[in-house]
Amino acid sequence: MHAPPTATRRSGPRRTHGIMARLVRLAAGVLVVTLVIGALTALSADDAKTHPHKVCIHDELQQSLLDSVAQQGLAPQRVSRVGLPYVASATAAPAAQVGGVDFALAGDSAPDVTRSAEWGELRITVSAEELTDPAYHCATVGQVISNHIDDYVTCTADDIMTAEKLDILMNYLIPEALQMHKDRLQVQQVQGTWKVARMTSYCGRFKVPEEHFTTGLSNTDFVLYVASVPTSPGVLAWANTCQVFSNDQPAVGVINIPAATITERYDHLMVHAVTHEIAHSLGFSNAFFTNTGIGQFVTGVRGNPDTVPVINSPTVVAKAREHYGCDDVTYVELEDAGGSGTMGSHWKIRNAQDELMAGISGVAYYTSLTLSAFEDLGYYKANYSNAETMKWGKDVGCAFLTGKCVVDNVTQFPSMYCDKDENVYRCHTARLNLGSCEVTDYTFDLPDYLQYFTVPSVGGSADYYDYCPYIVRSPIGSCTQAASSASPFVSAFNTFSMASRCIDGTFTPKSTGGATVTAHLGMCTNVACNTADKTYSIQVYGNGAYIPCTPGATISLDTVSDAFEAGGNITCPPYLEVCQSNVKGAMDYESMTNSGSGSSRPAPVEPSGSGSGSSAATTAPSPTRDGSAAADRIAPRTAAVALLALAVAAACV
């Protein structure tokens, strides 16, 4: 994801100034920078905790588990072709001590389970006993606990599992994520009772109710054990499959959702991050792709001499042809960049940036691409009527998949890729952020197949995108950030909330937040979504009322708000681009129209384990909000942002 350390940003065109003016500005800038360095350190640290850049470490963890299982020396018939152990039998069996880990023996072959002949709801049991046991999660600052991977960590204030965070986790994040899968995937349900085998590696570090080993689980097709312990910087959550049924279908999984990443109830990024990780535990993984035969390697992709992982199964190919509008598709690329945590278990972000199973965080739509991969594994039946729509790559044709994104300095796909470094805000394609195009000039020439500009050392800033230039999200431009902590610069023309989305336009705010960069091509507006009629209204900066926004219509900003200069406007995007998966936007509409009584949210999950097979039970403890603590956190951030605004002003005059 990151540019090589030798890369330097290639600046776009700027106004010419006199030498004296430059010296004055430089002196002012040096003074401000001297003041701001300490504040920026605190600001960047706070941003990392509040809006971390998602890094997926799935494959790295999966390989660690596979290596651990292989080292146990289990009989071949007790290990699946995926390399994971089978669940224990549903009847009593002796136990063997293997390498310090108890495994329930299944006999001479994998334990069979009886399945329904019909397809039915995917029943997921959630066990979260760790969240009520202070020995397994951060209960006090300075406490030392296992991170469930390979180390012990010291708990900080951000790591504490407060009552509010527990409420968000158990009553919103997990139920919403589970429902995303249950609405779209069916299984041939397991009949009767089955038992979990005692586990090794990081799977064995999760707290499992003893009855899951002895009595077993019923009415359950998959059991998920939940932890909340600190993890590596930039990781929102991680999950994996631990055990499988006799047909290699995932049966047991684990997920860790660190308390430090739980901040807001309707956080779109976190809901989809949890959904993404649960998908890995359900089998969206290189290990399953390879061992079921749907994953392959090809060479020569867009001139790339290296082998590239792909899926070439029939349903995936058919759905890709529909999405991209290309009948020549014979495979869909998986990620070949990003290292061992990302390669092979995600769609290639160049081709599917906004998909649920792309390798970095984003809007993460659950599209027919991911559904078809699940279906072609053979374990699931997909409900394509509930597939979400992704604008990225939609009907762009074969050239997008086979050709270059930019040719002779000109983008071939302007809705996705750009070609000029710029100093203006516009909407990121996912509409959750403001951003700008970044073009980088490296100190070396890029390979021929990655050269898009007449200068061979120039390209985009990320290897994930094959160095295609794209709209990079601004670190201060999240539409869903708290308004109270937003910088003065972006606060001058945006509205922020969990329902806010970015809308394209051309306008100049009357207030510039201390900077002289005044013209913009996008703004964050609150969105209220009428899910019944597929219509929406928006609230722009400077106007407390919501106004209808008809897709394709242009709104003159000076007619609806006094905050903008005359002549500015915005253009209403399609309904799906601002309302699909916008849970808070739908709730805000219901609240405004007093029609919320009929709405239903997924049931909460109980923070304790049982073998009943139900993923919905009693609610978690009621949260208690600490307003004073929140104010204390905001105050230093606000000061840092104020100093940052001064630095921006000094640099932009």
UniProtKB/Swiss-Prot annotation:
Primary location class: membrane
Which residues does the entry assign to the active site, renumbered to this chain?
Answer: 277
Q: How does it sit in the membrane?
A: Lipid-anchor; GPI-anchor
- The record places the lipid (GPI-anchor amidated serine) at 628
Q: Which residues bind Zn(2+)?
A: 276, 280, 346
Low complexity composition bias: residue spans = 607-631
Could you tell me which InterPro entries the record lists for this protein? Peptidase_M8
Example GO molecular function term? metalloendopeptidase activity
What cofactor does this protein call for? Zn(2+)
Which cysteines does the record link by disulfide bonds?
A: 138-155, 203-242, 326-398, 405-468, 418-437, 427-502, 479-524, 529-579, 549-572
The record's comment on cofactor binding reads:
Binds 1 zinc ion per subunit.
**What is one GO cellular-component annotation here?**
plasma membrane
EC assignment: the record states 3.4.24.36
Note the pro-peptide positions: 45-113, 629-653
The Polar residues compositionally biased stretches are: 591-600
Q: Which residues are glycosylated?
A: 383, 409, 569
Would you indicate the residue range of the signal peptide? 1-44
* SUPFAM superfamilies per record: Metalloproteases ('zincins'), catalytic domain
Which key words are in the record? Answer: Cell adhesion, Cell membrane, Disulfide bond, Glycoprotein, GPI-anchor, Hydrolase, Lipoprotein, Membrane, Metal-binding, Metalloprotease, Protease, Signal, Zinc, Zymogen
Q: Which reaction does it catalyse?
A: Preference for hydrophobic residues at P1 and P1' and basic residues at P2' and P3'. A model nonapeptide is cleaved at -Ala-Tyr-|-Leu-Lys-Lys-
User: Where in this protein does the record put region Disordered?
Assistant: 590-631
Does the keyword Ligase feature in the UniProt annotation? no
**One Pfam family this sequence matches:** Peptidase_M8
Q: Give the function comment from the record.
A: Plays an integral role during the infection of macrophages in the mammalian host.
Which protein family is named in the record? Belongs to the peptidase M8 family.
Protein name from the UniProt record? Leishmanolysin homolog
Name its species.
Crithidia fasciculata
